[in-house]
Amino acid sequence: LDHDDLLQPQAIYRVAQCVLADDPDMLYSDEVLVSPDGSQVLQYFHRPAFSPEYLRSHPYIVHMVGFRTALLRQLGGFDETLAISQDYDLILRVSEAASRIAHIPEILYQWRTHTGSAGHEKMAQVMATSTAVLQRHLERTGQQATSVSGVSFNFFEPRHQIAADQRVAIIIPTKNYGHLVRQCVDSIRATTK
């Protein structure tokens, strides 16, 4: 919870329900981005179920996150050397060690936007730090991949090294739309190295 944001009235109750039912090591909820005074909803963030692949490409778990205290202590908590992206780093480290991660598919958090936030004023620094945090995660998890910035703010592309003799299968679900196969194949040929 950031210092200037708001919890929905039912937030703590829903977290308690989740803890009792699922016993997660980490939990997170959906959220809304609201105006500085909280009077207007600017954007809804309906989070997906936990996906390590998606988390590596976008830090979609941001606010209304809960952690098992023992696991947080075991991992050393926030990395104080990171001025920005310390939350993404912690979520990646917890995801590496967690047995259970739960998503509460309900808006429990109001994130107030303001011009002084790091996401608004320090976009280049956020991208550089988050890319480095992701690279550390890839190395810790033994993945032969390089973290690079994606096509837009706060998106990343973990580029996995594939041996020259390694085969890659691509499934193209088109269901009776043969013309889509041609488009997909042309796109793959144009963008694959």
What feature does the model see in each segment?
Residues 6-42, 70, 113-114:
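Conserved donor NDP-sugar-binding/catalytic core segment of glycosyltransferases
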Residues 89, 166-171:
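Cell-envelope/extracellular polymer assembly enzymes that use nucleotide-activated donors
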Residues 1-3:
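Catalytic metal- and UDP-sugar-binding loop of GT-A-like glycosyltransferases, i.e.
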Residues 172-183:
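Active-site beta-to-alpha loop of glycosyltransferases that engages the nucleotide-sugar donor
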Residues 28-64:
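Acidic/His-rich active-site region of diverse nucleotide-sugar glycosyltransferases
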Residues 51-132:
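Conserved nucleotide-sugar donor-binding catalytic segment
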Residues 123-165:
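C-terminal, non-catalytic tails of nucleotide-sugar-dependent glycosyltransferases
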Residues 186-193:
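Short, acidic, metal-binding catalytic loop of nucleotide-sugar glycosyltransferases
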